[in-house]
Amino acid sequence: VRPLLLLHPFPQTANKCLTPVYYGRYLGFDKAPHMWGGWAEYVYVDLEMLPGTKIYKLPDDMSLRLGALSEPLTSCIRAFNRASRAGGFSWGDTVVIQGSGPIGILAVAAAREMGAGRVICVGAPEEPRLKLAREFGAEATVNIQEIKSPQERIARVREIVGGFGADLVMDCSGHPTAGPEGIEMLRDGGTYVEMGQFTDAGSIETSWHRICTKDLNVLGSWGFTGNDLPLGVDMLYRTRDKYPWLKMQTIYPFTEEGVAQAVKDAMAMKTVKSTIVPWPELVE
């Protein structure tokens, strides 16, 4: 759990500044009293130390397990809203999602709920990730373990999409090679949204000439603001029976062995979302 606790010392906050970086704070367990978040039954929040902190109550009939998906889903919703405000995402658009991890699959669902006409997911492996992406609404998937050449993947996406390319491509993988590949999947005048680089994966080598010649919009999206979070909670609640949300999660106990196995399986892409629970009742 990485709670984004929003402060309000700047006028940009009240004015709904679109960039949360300047006044958002991530809190780790290194700061006293060491109970800011993580795999715990309770979280300590000092409202005097962190004035303006927003706390949202989940609906009474929403499980904590389902509610745990609100944070990553909200990030996806905000990324599409960013594109929409910039004129790069409209009802009926064709969307390509790069990445089939938890963010990628949640982005597939968000794209569907926010009006995308067609959604294609590029990622791996087939089991459990690409199969689940299709269950969440991806019309087609492209397996990068089977189609290993970037040029072949670009050609395959264009074959599926037809015409001149996708209206919007969103990177949810965070891999440095995704950007150069993704912009070639776009139609001229399309929009590329980078939301996968939430850790520094290094420099991305691409020709900016292609961005110019294709007349592209390129946007970055970082996390979400406190005003965005209710959108994620609301979508989960409204569609709780529409999408197989809980199939994303593989449950592990909060033990030394359980945590180690959860991380190991996630790194090996054997799970979509390794979920560590502090007490068994959470999964009932």
Predicted regions and their residues:
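Adenosine-nucleotide cofactor-binding segment
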Residues: 94-100, 112-181
